[in-house]
Amino acid sequence: MSKNSVIIVAAGKGKRMNSSISKQFLQIKNKPILYYTLSKFSTHESIDEIVLVTLEDKIEVCSDIIDKYNINKVSKIVPGGKERQDSVYNGLKGVSKDCEVVLIHDAARPFVTSDIIENGIRYTNQYGAAACGVIPKDTIKIKNEKGFAIDTPNREDLFIVQTPQCFNYNIILSCHEKLKKHNKKVTDDTMVLENYGKSVYLYEGSYSNIKITTPEDLILGEQILEKLT
């Protein structure tokens, strides 16, 4: 039977947090951010396995969190790579052979909802690839190299991409392998498919599905958690 797998990318160092502790290990309400993220997927009935990607020297820390909070479905903890795309590729190589849909999610994005996860799987089965996100609330400007505004795109045409980003496993693995061969650099996994002419369906995420990257995000995260509990 085919599986739905999730790769949790926890290999970042979180330089913008101005902390010696990686952002995924910082705490909200006395629990590490990674705990909340793992719990969302481990308790979701449509997720069959979790592959956690982290820094090699943080594998034991992750293992301790998994054991302490009795988190199920984590099949492997694998070391990350030099760049995020390398870490994702390592995760892709670590999922089960019978994986059909793979979700790729930021460890520092702990407020993903069950509906976002379920819709990602559903749209991937329908279209082959899907990513959640939101329309920007603010007006976006395009500026030139001298710093002057030159255009104002329609907000309805813009989309702030979040995670999970969800894919047919064979499609995303094939595109990542081509990316390595051609030595291309990307900032997220939708770009991996775009590089090879593949379409990604964009569906509604949540403004609460934030990625915690700055000290201000930690404060906002506490407020979001209070509303959710």
From Swiss-Prot:
One of its GO terms (cellular component) is cytosol. Gene3D superfamilies: Spore Coat Polysaccharide Biosynthesis Protein SpsA, Chain A. Pfam families: IspD. The keyword Nucleotidyltransferase applies. It is an enzyme of class 2 (transferase). The record marks R155, K211 as: Positions MEP for the nucleophilic attack. PROSITE patterns: ISPD. Keywords: Isoprene biosynthesis, Nucleotidyltransferase, Transferase. It catalyses: 2-C-methyl-D-erythritol 4-phosphate + CTP + H(+) = 4-CDP-2-C-methyl-D-erythritol + diphosphate. Belongs to the IspD/TarI cytidylyltransferase family. IspD subfamily. Catalyzes the formation of 4-diphosphocytidyl-2-C-methyl-D-erythritol from CTP and 2-C-methyl-D-erythritol 4-phosphate (MEP). This is 2-C-methyl-D-erythritol 4-phosphate cytidylyltransferase. It comes from Clostridium botulinum (strain Hall / ATCC 3502 / NCTC 13319 / Type A). The lineage of its organism: Bacteria, Bacillati, Bacillota, Clostridia, Eubacteriales. The gene is ispD.
